[in-house]
Amino acid sequence: MSKDKLWGGRFTQPTDAFVEEFTASIQFDKRLYHQDIRGSIAHARMLGKQGIIPQADVEAIVEGLQQILLQIEEGSFDFSISLEDIHMNIESRLSARIGEAGKRLHTGRSRNDQVALDIRLYLRDEIVEITSYIDLLIDALLTQAEENVDVVMPGFTHLQTAQPILFAHHMLAYVEMFKRDSGRMEDCLKRVNVLPLGAGALAGTTFPIDRDYVAEQLGFPAITRNSLDSVSDRDFALEFISASSILMMHLSRLSEELILWSTSQFKFIELSDGFCTGSSIMPQKKNPDVPELVRGKTGRVYGNLMALLTVMKSLPLAYNKDMQEDKEPLFDTIDTVKGSLKVFSDMIREMSIYPEAMGRAAGQGFSTATDVADYLVRKGVAFRDAHEAVGKAVAYCVENEMELTDLTLTEWELFSPRFEQDIFEAITVDACIDARNVPGGTAREQVKGEIARCRKGK
């Protein structure tokens, strides 16, 4: 049994040693040390400003906390499981260092609003960093688009050849996805960036604190408006993991395409050696481990979202010990997203493109069939009739092992008398691409304009 029990005045028995270890969170919440100290310094200064504790105590507290911060960053601070969490590890060391003044730090504050503050401070910084990583990935995608703006490739639906597009257009599709991810992170930040400190355990405090002062000190534009909600709320963490799940889904989709494109069957791209591994038995192998692992880690983030949703789903107000389980899913999501984004932006930047293979594939699989139908529509044929005629032409080509470009005018006329000599110009891959000159389309003019617009941050 543990000899000393935290806040043990009400108890007659010490905490069981295994229970002490089981309930401790210091193993994972110690990463909040910087935010905990920063929040405590702001709280102490507010207590002094309001005359709640002597100014001399404030100075001792601030100096003591700064020394503890230095110790932690130097690696000389010994974290104790018996002190349960980062809050008590720091407060206990502070009291041991400066004496009675350290015991006054927690005046007007509960661990409930303290931990809510720490998590918000931590997540706020991480969202800013994650958004910067998204920007780097967008830049890498735009660079590939710029450098390969004339490269054509097949576009797919159902993973079957559909219509020819520009490779740059495909890259821009992911730019749009990641721009939305960035927007979701920025929107989430608005709800993270609210000060909960001052809510106390659940009902506020009897001391004349100044929450707005603390908010200003810590860079929060607003304070929470209900003490119960302040300590019960983990919506902001759920929202972040939800946004992260969508972000990882986009990375997973791109991963899947890079894996396919790098196969010998496609050979559209090649990933740099630094992002691939070999085989323990097959000497020829170059395995795309990085996109495969990111694809796998996507499920991990989904699991974190489900874990935290399940923790929160039946909790009565206000704080419950269940909520200690919020940190590991949150921290793991942050680490996974940051790592995935960082490795992806570098991998995309170093990726090699094979225009010849893409170009050959773009003209195969009857990719210009839609344009043949559109050609007939311009000649006065109803679209459904045009669709039927071109379908028959495709069937003819399949039966005779031909492509549409192999047909003679006489053969075209078998399917519609409206076909003329200009059909041959209308169904080249380049003509089909440039014909889609509408906003959002794959025409070169549109794609180049979109790249320029993205570069301007629009």
Swiss-Prot record:
PROSITE patterns: FUMARATE_LYASES (PS00163)
Subcellular location field: Cytoplasm
Predominant place of localization: cytoplasm
Glycoprotein as UniProt keyword: no
Domain of life of the native organism: Bacteria
Pathway membership: Amino-acid biosynthesis; L-arginine biosynthesis; L-arginine from L-ornithine and carbamoyl phosphate: step 3/3
UniProt catalytic activity: 2-(N(omega)-L-arginino)succinate = fumarate + L-arginine
Alphabetical keyword list: Amino-acid biosynthesis, Arginine biosynthesis, Cytoplasm, Lyase
UniProt-listed SUPFAM superfamilies: L-aspartase-like (SSF48557)
GO molecular function: argininosuccinate lyase activity
Catalytic activity, EC: 4.3.2.1
A Gene Ontology term for the protein's cellular component: cytosol
GO biological process: arginine biosynthetic process via ornithine; L-arginine biosynthetic process
Cystines in this chain: none
HAMAP family, per the entry: Arg_succ_lyase (MF_00006)
Homology family: Belongs to the lyase 1 family. Argininosuccinate lyase subfamily.
Protein known as: Argininosuccinate lyase
Organism annotation: Pelobacter propionicus (strain DSM 2379 / NBRC 103807 / OttBd1)
